[in-house]
Amino acid sequence: MSILDKKALKFLEDYLNNAAPTGYESGGQKIWMNYLKPYVDEFITDVYGTAVGVINPEAKYKVVIEGHSDEISWYVNYITDNGLIYVIRNGGSDHQIAPSKWV
């Protein structure tokens, strides 16, 4: 028996199939916020791709559900005649993980 209902599975499928590389997080934010909408009273977003749902925002103590929605991404910059792929990174991924790696 799954602990995820159909709505949760649909959210997970939509979220995982959505491209949200660094700088283009808004699609992921929208999916996350639509899923949380029935459970929170307000949302806060920032320019870094964070979406926060707040329960009972006027209370002294609040419940906050937070998610950061970008993913590591690299762009193909060039492909050689021998099939070597040259990539450039997008965002803050570690540049030392890519050189001479099999893809």
Please provide the spans of the model-predicted regions.
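N-terminal hydrophobic/helix-forming segments and targeting peptides
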Residues: 1-103
